[in-house]
């Protein structure tokens, strides 16, 4: 259950319309690295996260991403509020206007509609947290790109705040990922087999209820590394 407060997480007070910049910023509403995809990613992943501490982090950050989406929508709304037909045509906002008038609709800067394919939820803690860390860096890069294009301090101020929060989220997911990796038990058995004429040693884990994901991850990395070295030596 969420409690909604009738205020933005960070103030958005834009006094000058700018539909050209609105078309850029809207990407952080419905683009591939936007806040809508981020919130859906984390709030979906939390159900199959095996560790309560990390589930809490996913819930916290997923909830905050909803607040960030609200901020982005407020920015776009204030940048396009009460536009005249002349302004809409002058700044190239006509294509969006035809389909949505001045309503908010999730799309990327290029006009691509939002899609659930922008995020994954795999049910494996390392896989999901790795995606989460990458997602936060991609969002941070997108905000960097926006700040390179925008000079208005009224717009830059909330965008900088959002960028800073992406860095904090990345750090929190990194800490969670390290905590997950520390739960991998020590190896107990060593299995040997040959490939490309080389002998490989694979140590497996036992006595852990999440053994399969970690075991498969370790096996994949080990086999790819060893086979790659073997193939290189035969060329």
Residue ranges of each PLM-predicted region?
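Non-heme di-metal
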Residues: 1-209, 214-222, 226-228, 234
């Amino acid at each position: 259950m969420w409690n909604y407060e009738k205020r933005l997480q960070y103030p958005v007070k834009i006094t000058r319309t700018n539909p050209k910049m609105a078309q850029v910023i809207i990407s952080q509403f419905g683009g591939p690295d936007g806040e809508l995809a981020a919130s859906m990613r984390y709030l979906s992943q939390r159900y199959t996260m095996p560790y309560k501490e990390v589930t809490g982090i996913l819930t916290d950050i997923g909830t905050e991403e909803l607040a960030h989406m609200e901020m982005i929508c407020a920015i776009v709304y204030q940048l396009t509020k009460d536009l005249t037909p002349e302004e809409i045509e002058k700044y190239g906002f006509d294509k969006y206007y035809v389909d949505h008038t001045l309503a908010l609709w999730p799309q990327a800067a290029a006009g691509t509609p939002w899609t659930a394919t922008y995020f994954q939820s795999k049910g494996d803690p390392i896989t999901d947290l790795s995606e989460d860390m990458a997602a936060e860096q991609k969002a941070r890069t997108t905000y960097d790109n926006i700040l390179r294009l925008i000079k208005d301090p009224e717009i830059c101020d909330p965008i900088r705040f959002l960028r800073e929060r992406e860095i904090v989220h990345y750090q929190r997911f990194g800490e969670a990922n390290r905590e997950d990796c520390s739960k991998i038990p020590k190896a107990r058995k060593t299995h040997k087999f040959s490939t490309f004429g080389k002998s490989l040693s694979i140590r497996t884990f036992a006595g852990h209820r999440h053994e399969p994901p970690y075991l498969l991850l370790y096996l994949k990395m080990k086999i790819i590394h060893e086979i790659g070295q073997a193939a290189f030596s035969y060329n």
